[in-house]
Design a protein with these regions (language model features):
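A charged, amphipathic alpha-helical module
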Residues: 2-70, 186-289
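Redox- and metal-dependent alpha/beta enzyme cores, enriched for Fe-S-associated oxidoreductases
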Residues: 66, 78, 83-97, 104-105, ...
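Short, hydrophobic beta-strand segments that form beta-sheet elements in well-ordered domains
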Residues: 70-75, 138-141, 280
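Structural signal for conserved beta-strand scaffold positions within catalytic alpha/beta enzyme cores
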Residues: 74, 93, 162-164
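Short, acidic/turn-prone active-site loops that include or flank metal/cofactor-
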Residues: 95-101, 164-169
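Short, charged, surface-exposed secondary-structure boundary motifs
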Residues: 100-110, 170-176
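Glycine-rich, highly charged phosphate/nucleotide-binding loops
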Residues: 112-127
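Acidic/His-rich segments in extracytoplasmic proteins that coordinate ligands and/or metal ions
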Residues: 123-187
Length: 289
C-alpha cells in the first residue's frame, strides 16, 4: 500500500487526528465484512477500495486538479453528476457516515442537529478526510432546515453552491427544479472553464446510466433465494458508487454480477434459502455506520 501522508499534509489535513480514525477502521471492516462466509470473489476489488479509502481515489482527484481539472464535492443524490462530467470535472460524493466527525460539527452547530449534518461539517472542519479537502466547489441542497444552516457555516470555510430543492411535486415545482439544474450548469461551466456541449452531455449521460444499470443489475440479484450477496456487501458497493471512477465502478460491478448470476444458476448463496430479510429505506448507510 502506498504512503499518502505527504498528500494529506499538502491538503492541510490534521494527520495525527486522521491516524486515530484510520486505526479503528481495519478491525471494524474485518468484523463486519471480511469475516462473512462465502463472500463472492468479486468483492475483492471493493474491499481494496475501502482498505485504501483515503489514498487511491483522493490521489486520482489530486492528479485531476494538477492536470487543470476541477473536482466538485456533492451531498446526497440530487446533484446531476452528468453536468459536472460533461464540463470535464469529477463529481465525488461526500458522506457524514462516521461518529468520529460529530464533535467537530458540534463546535459550530446546535447539539440537537442530526448526526449526519454534524459529521458532514465536522469532516471538513476537523481536516481528517481528504475527500473534504480536495473539491474546488461543494454543492449542497435544501432537503432540510439543518442542511440549509450547515451550508451557511461551510461557506465560511470553503466555496459552496446550494441547489434549492422544491418541497412538493407540482408542475411549478418541476419547472423550478429544471431552472435549478440550468443554474447549476452555468455555475459548473464558470468553475470548470469548460462549456457543456450536447456531445459531452450525451457521453456523460451514457456513462452515468451505465453505472446505474450496473447497480440495478446488482440489486436484482438479491431478489433470489438463496441470496448470492449479503445486504451489507450490497450497501458497501452502493456507497463506493458515490466516489469511485464511474466507468471503472460499472465494469467491476458488472464483473461481480457475472459471478453472482452464475451462483444463482447453481442455486448457491451466502445465506440459507428463505432466510429472513430486513428492509432498510432512506439515506444510504455509510461505513462505518
Amino acid at each position: 500500500m502506498a504512503d499518502y501522508r505527504q498528500m494529506w499534509i499538502d491538503l492541510g489535513m490534521d494527520v495525527e487526528k486522521h491516524d486515530m480514525l484510520g486505526a479503528v477502521l481495519p478491525d471494524m471492516f474485518q468484523q463486519v465484512y471480511l469475516l462473512q462466509d462465502q463472500r463472492p470473489q468479486g468483492m475483492n476489488y471493493f474491499d481494496a477500495v475501502v482498505a485504501d479509502i483515503h489514498g487511491i481515489r483522493p490521489a486520482e482527484l489530486v492528479q485531476h486538479r494538477q492536470n487543470g481539472g476541477k473536482v466538485f464535492g456533492t451531498f446526497c443524490v440530487y446533484v446531476p453528476d452528468e453536468i459536472i462530467i460533461a464540463a470535464g470535472g469529477i463529481a465525488t460524493g461526500l458522506c457524514g457516515g462516521s461518529q468520529f466527525w460529530v464533535p467537530g460539527g458540534e463546535t459550530v452547530l446546535p447539539l440537537n442537529t442530526c448526526s449526519l449534518i454534524k459529521a458532514s461539517i465536522g469532516a471538513r472542519l476537523d481536516k481528517t478526510c481528504p475527500f473534504f479537502r480536495i473539491p474546488d466547489l461543494y454543492i449542497g441542497e435544501t432537503t432540510c432546515d439543518g442542511k440549509k444552516k450547515a451550508w451557511e457555516i461551510l461557506a465560511q470555510d470553503a466555496p459552496v453552491y446550494v441547489m434549492d430543492l422544491p418541497q412538493m411535486k407540482r408542475r411549478q415545482d418541476v419547472e423550478a427544479w429544471e431552472n435549478e439544474i440550468k443554474l447549476l450548469l452555468q455555475k459548473v461551466e464558470e468553475v470548470s472553464g469548460h462549456k457543456v456541449t450536447p456531445e459531452s452531455l450525451d457521453r456523460s449521460i451514457k456513462l452515468i446510466n451505465n453505472k446505474r444499470k450496473a447497480l440495478a443489475r446488482l440489486y436484482n440479484t438479491r431478489k433470489n433465494s438463496p441470496v448470492p450477496i449479503s445486504g451489507k456487501d450490497a450497501l458497501l458497493i452502493s456507497q463506493i458508487a458515490f466516489y469511485d471512477d464511474p466507468e471503472r465502478f460499472a465494469n467491476m460491478t458488472n464483473a461481480l454480477c457475472d459471478e453472482l448470476e452464475a451462483s444463482v444458476q447453481k442455486g448457491e448463496g451466502v445465506l440459507p434459502k428463505n432466510a429472513p430479510r430486513i428492509l432498510i429505506t432512506g439515506t444510504p448507510m455509510a461505513v462505518p455506520n
